[in-house]
Design a protein with these regions (language model features):
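Bacterial Sec-dependent N-terminal signal peptides
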Residues: 1-22
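Extracellular/periplasmic carbohydrate-active domains that bind, remodel
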Residues: 18-189
């Protein structure tokens, strides 16, 4: 029994990035002003951390606007209290992807902390409707959610708030294995 508890604790610490390098979002020119689109900077930070063998990208207090960001194996996202990942209200920021944070075939990653992922769903849906009316996008265009994971393994989603998705569901997990969701709160006011 002690052996199982020890192995579980070791897996939890390694997946959550507690034994890995921690990289502050501000070091990657990621702006916390709630205005600038940080999609390229956040993706660049995740790609860099993955190329270094993994670690944690840490967001401190602020509002970080982004479109779709691809998660990578070995890279965790930490949302400190007061950190809000704010989904872009421009459908083109998602490039046809299904979520603000999305991953397919990702292993050993986590999103954790007491921050918020805010999809600004009503405003995004207004933009999608306008783009459909102008025939700029098809009527069956992908409407992004907040977190989308497909065929992912050894994933922990812990303690953050999911707010205002543009879809009925804020979190999609399709297949995969050893995915833990613990202490997350859905605020769909």
């Amino acid at each position: 029994m002690k052996r199982i508890l020890l192995l579980t604790a070791l897996l939890l610490f390694s997946v959550m990035g507690l034994s890995q390098n921690v990289y502050k979002a501000s070091n990657f020119n990621i702006k916390s002003d709630g205005v600038h689109d940080n999609t390229t900077s956040i993706q660049g930070a995740i790609d860099f951390i993955a190329s270094k063998g993994g670690g944690t990208l840490e967001f401190s207090v602020g509002r970080y606007v982004t479109g779709a960001v691809q998660l990578k194996s070995g890279v965790s996202i930490r949302l400190r209290e007061g950190a809000v990942i704010v989904g872009s209200t421009n459908i083109y920021s998602y490039k046809g992807r299904k979520a603000v944070f999305w991953g397919e075939g990702v292993e050993n990653m986590s999103i954790f902390g007491t921050g918020v992922i805010d999809g600004r769903g009503p405003a995004l849906l207004d933009d999608i409707a306008a783009q459909i009316r102008m025939k700029h996008i098809p009527e069956d265009a992908v409407v992004p959610t907040l977190v989308y994971l497909k065929d992912c393994k050894n994933v922990i989603l812990k303690d953050f708030i999911l707010r205002y998705p543009a879809t009925k569901d804020d979190l999609y997990i399709i297949e995969g294995g050893n995915v833990t969701v613990d202490g997350c709160y859905s605020d769909m006011r």
